[in-house]
Amino acid sequence: MDVTIQHPWFKRALGPFYPSRLFDQFFGEGLFEYDLLPFLSSTISPYYRQSLFRTVLDSGISEVRSDRDKFVIFLDVKHFSPEDLTVKVQEDFVEIHGKHNERQDDHGYISREFHRRYRLPSNVDQSALSCSLSADGMLTFSGPKVQSGLDAGHSERAIPVSREEKPSSAPSS
């Protein structure tokens, strides 16, 4: 039996009208709404299924903004409380770590952990960094930029995560 090998360029998720091959699926991800609707999955071919692009986009994607005056990171951490999050700055990097122990949900028990590391621009004032968690679970890490030529104060330190009562003003992806 011959198996066709696809170049990664052809594996791009192009939406519901360009399904991915069954062999390209993410095993262990569970069933999705379109898996339960037979006319969507079998209309084209029984060996094709819809792309998981939307699912991947909805799973904790971060957004980094760096403009003239400030540097901001938005990170979706809706499954974590401020006590579960650790944010620290080390040299030119900000490290965000989240971990919660096993807890029960509607489908059984689940534990989550992630670790993100971002490079800070050299002109970010590290003494004025802040981090907050909105009511809808959006973590916002920000710091002002200083004029070039001034010392931005690089050192290792922890940044406390404060909780906001209002939803985030970050744009939805």
Swiss-Prot record:
Glycans are attached at S162. Zn(2+) 2 binds at H107. One of its GO terms (cellular component) is cytoplasm. Contributes to the transparency and refractive index of the lens. Acts as a chaperone, preventing aggregation of various proteins under a wide range of stress conditions. Required for the correct formation of lens intermediate filaments as part of a complex composed of BFSP1, BFSP2 and CRYAA. The modification Phosphoserine is found at S45, S122. Pfam families: Crystallin (PF00525), HSP20 (PF00011). The modification Deamidated glutamine is found at Q6, Q50, Q90, Q147. Keywords: Acetylation, Chaperone, Cytoplasm, Eye lens protein, Glycoprotein, Metal-binding, Methylation, Nucleus, Phosphoprotein, Zinc. Acetylation at Lys-70 may increase chaperone activity. Undergoes age-dependent proteolytical cleavage at the C-terminus. One of its GO terms (molecular function) is metal ion binding. Heteromer composed of three CRYAA and one CRYAB subunits. Inter-subunit bridging via zinc ions enhances stability, which is crucial as there is no protein turn over in the lens. Can also form homodimers and homotetramers (dimers of dimers) which serve as the building blocks of homooligomers. Within homooligomers, the zinc-binding motif is created from residues of 3 different molecules. His-100 and Glu-102 from one molecule are ligands of the zinc ion, and His-107 and His-154 residues from additional molecules complete the site with tetrahedral coordination geometry. Its main location: cytoplasm. This is Alpha-crystallin A chain. Zn(2+) 3 binds at H154. GO terms for biological process: lens development in camera-type eye; negative regulation of apoptotic process; protein refolding; response to heat. Zn(2+) 1 binds at H100, E102. Residues 145-173 are annotated as: Disordered. Belongs to the small heat shock protein (HSP20) family. Residues 1-63 are annotated as: Required for complex formation with BFSP1 and BFSP2. Residues 153-167 have a biased composition (Basic and acidic residues). The modification N-acetylmethionine is found at M1.
